[in-house]
């Protein structure tokens, strides 16, 4: 979301607009005309974290009387909402497919997920909501089906790619990158890009390459990374599953790969698809 917001700020940067960002923390670029409001109240758990930020952010924008509030979080009272994560209940349904029945029941009973679904419904039913932006027709249909929102309030705007930046590599670049990261030049390497390994299907990706001679290049982070490393070890493919962590520049990793492997459970129009295609994967 931060990368999207940074790009949106760049596009909207104008002397005719006063741009404000309300966030828990900001690590992106800052321009003199941008106002960054750090809003990070004390928290005691996941629900407290979400509810505290929502209440504090709403209080701030009401106090400042902004002309237009676009939110990337499920906060009732915003004018525009970008549904980049889709519909939470639909994500839980997809997640439950890979869980035992008893875990699936616990998933929908979980207090945190119930809070998120309640906040989402309150946001869609709030009279202040003037429009919703989503990046896939699937999400538009799900919002209409789950919340009864009018179709003319929902705008599908597809993700874009800078194809002057994301390019296929030349032979020399490809060979140099393979040598730098100690990957065999002739090996078939599949890249996986994304954080939140469960949602993005990393376990399925590891199991898919295990019985082959393919390499899997994992770019992203997750607090449960050791569990996925243990899975690779148990399948005797740990030498071919390389974890590179979070990378501020992903281009070199696309350029040294042969293909993209992203068996994600629920991920509307992920940017990595466009980035990989632009790099010739």
Model-predicted segments: where are they?
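A conserved mid-protein helix/loop that constitutes part of the nucleotide-sugar donor-binding site
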Residues: 2-7, 188-211, 223-226
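Membrane-proximal helix-turn-helix segments that form the acceptor-binding/catalytic region
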Residues: 109-132
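A short helix/loop element that forms part of the nucleotide-sugar donor recognition site in Leloir-type
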Residues: 167-183
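Aromatic "clamp/platform" in nucleotide-sugar-dependent glycosyltransferases that forms part
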Residues: 246, 265
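Short glycine/serine-rich donor-binding loops of glycosyltransferases
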Residues: 251, 270-273
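A short hydrophobic beta-strand element within the catalytic core of glycosyltransferases
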Residues: 260-261, 276
């Amino acid at each position: 979301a931060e990368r999207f917001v940074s790009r949106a700020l760049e596009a909207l940067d104008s002397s005719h607009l006063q741009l404000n960002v309300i966030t828990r923390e900001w690590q992106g670029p800052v321009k003199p005309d941008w106002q960054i409001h750090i809003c990070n109240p004390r928290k005691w758990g996941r629900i407290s974290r979400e509810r505290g930020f929502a209440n504090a952010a709403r209080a701030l924008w009401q106090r400042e009387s902004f002309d237009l509030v676009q939110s990337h979080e499920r906060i009732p009272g915003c004018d525009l909402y970008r549904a980049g994560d889709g519909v939470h209940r639909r994500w839980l349904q997809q997640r439950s497919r890979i869980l035992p029945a008893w875990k699936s029941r616990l998933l929908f009973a979980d207090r945190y997920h119930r809070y998120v679904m309640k906040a989402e419904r309150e946001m869609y039913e709030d009279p202040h909501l003037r429009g919703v932006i989503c990046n896939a027709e699937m999400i538009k249909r799900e919002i209409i089906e789950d919340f009864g929102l009018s179709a003319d309030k929902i705008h599908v705007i597809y993700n874009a790619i800078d194809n002057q930046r994301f390019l296929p590599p030349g032979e020399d670049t490809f060979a140099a990158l393979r040598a730098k990261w100690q990957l065999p030049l002739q090996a078939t390497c599949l890249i996986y890009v994304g954080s939140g390994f469960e949602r993005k299907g990393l376990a399925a990706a590891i199991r898919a390459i295990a019985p082959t001679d393919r390499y899997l290049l994992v770019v992203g982070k997750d607090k449960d990374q050791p569990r996925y490393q243990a899975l690779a070890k148990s399948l005797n493919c740990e030498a071919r599953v390389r974890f590179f962590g979070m990378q501020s520049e992903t281009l070199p990793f696309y350029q040294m790969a042969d293909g993209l492997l992203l068996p994600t459970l629920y991920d509307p129009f992920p940017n990595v698809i466009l980035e990989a295609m632009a790099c010739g994967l």
